[in-house]
Design a protein with these regions (language model features):
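Active-site loop signature of alpha/beta-hydrolase-fold enzymes
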Residues: 92, 165, 177
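Conserved strand-to-helix beginnings and helix N-cap segments that scaffold or border functional pockets
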Residues: 48-49, 80, 153, 171, ...
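All-alpha amphipathic helical-bundle segments outside canonical DNA-binding/catalytic cores
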Residues: 203-210
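Juxta-kinase regulatory segment immediately upstream of eukaryotic protein kinase catalytic domains
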Residues: 1-13
Length: 210
């Protein structure tokens, strides 16, 4: 099915590997350098449309890599139209909670700064999605450890999966960061450090406006 869909985009498939799936979509690695996301249901197709709008709007404005849109298209399944898109494979590797929490404190401290900067920059973007209520911001919507990639120095270098992005309260992106009990997430100590950095950046920014 993936090869047939890509044939319409004149993408010649030399290699194809299943990367994984989430609630909304399945991801495939094509030719070792292109990630294609296919929706699993009708609502997921709408999420992919939002994701494309968000990553196109953000472009290179953030301090880490995010998906781009190399190509996009639609296919029909049982009479319904579904949207998909392809992006370049992002650099980095994933870490589970045990691996992440075992990082040296200076590395964790630096990662807390990187994450705080990413979230602040994301939340500061006013023109990617319509913001109608004062205080609302653009949120990632599913900011969890499994959506981060790390470079060879174990620093956050890429953020994945903007399919749940929407306009809402900035605290939504701290849900997993501040979770005390989730065995798959960052750990609340790290989350509190991120939040402290975030508030510091926000405070400096506000002071600069006066």
């Amino acid at each position: 099915e993936v090869e047939q869909i890509l044939r319409n985009k004149q993408v010649f498939v030399c290699s194809l590997a299943f990367l994984g799936e989430g609630e909304h979509s399945e991801a495939f690695l094509v030719n070792r350098d292109i990630v294609v996301k296919l929706p699993k249901h009708r609502q997921a197709s709408e999420c992919l449309k939002t994701e494309m709008q968000v990553v196109k709007g953000l472009g290179t404005k953030l301090n880490v890599e995010i998906p781009n849109v190399l190509f996009q298209g639609a296919f029909f399944h049982e009479g319904e139209e579904y949207t998909y898109f392809g992006s370049r494979k992002l650099p980095g590797h994933s870490l589970n909670k045990k691996q992440f929490c075992a990082l040296p404190k200076p590395i964790l401290d630096k990662n807390a700064e990187i994450v705080a900067n990413f979230l602040y920059r994301l939340h500061s973007e006013k023109n990617v999605l319509p913001i109608q209520r004062e205080g609302d911001v653009l949120v990632h919507g599913d900011f969890s450890l499994n959506h981060l990639l790390f470079d060879q120095n174990q620093m956050v270098c890429s953020v994945l999966d903007f399919g749940d992005s929407h306009v809402g309260d900035f605290q939504e992106d701290f849900l997993y960061l501040l979770d005390e009990e989730d065995e798959e997430e960052f750990g609340a100590d790290f989350g509190r450090e991120v939040l402290a950095n975030y508030k510091s950046i926000s405070s400096c920014s506000l002071q600069g406006e006066f």
